[in-house]
């Protein structure tokens, strides 16, 4: 079962949400709307290789059109003049493409540069005054600025392997907020269900040995990295801890959305979730399950 949800922001965001931001919102929603036992049961399914669902990275949704991460592929381009070189640099900096461009990349091996599609993201600065918690005044405090993001609509694609989780995941996403500074009203949105990108399901069901990932993904032994094209991101983020104290996770790295991997065995998903922090009896997990779309041009 393939579902798509669109987030329509009602407030600024601390940062652009990631795959793990969405997964964290779902997990906290399960704990608050169901129970801690249901959350632990769900996490156990992910830990033992039986994920009830997988999610894409947040994808910009512009005027009813899906925007995807630029597919990473080696394209031999030899600039012949200054204009060609400028176009090549522009292509190298591109981060997003339309679903139509991404789909063409899945249908046949790309031989030329892609046309970039830019989502609308506006930065703003909010002034704050440090508060003296003993006197409950700003006396002695310092003025500082906080950078925030005003995002246009974005969405996620969810592939359900267990259909009973569909109403629960939707309820959790309707209930939650995303990202940091929730107590100051950031990360609010209205959730709407919509149609997945046209024709996407066939690139999930018709598998091959070459896949493009549309979510952050931990390394999988099934990857042949010598014959793959990918970017790696290293992070040490704060814990999505549901309005409680700030805790930092251990450092980890994963393949970014848009990465192209040669796989030994075609599967529904790759990677997994990892324990990135343990404090006493509390374990913190990071979502790193790769959502693959399979290319037709390699069997």
Where do the language-model regions lie?
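Conserved active-site/ligand-binding neighborhood in enzyme cores
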Residues: 1-299
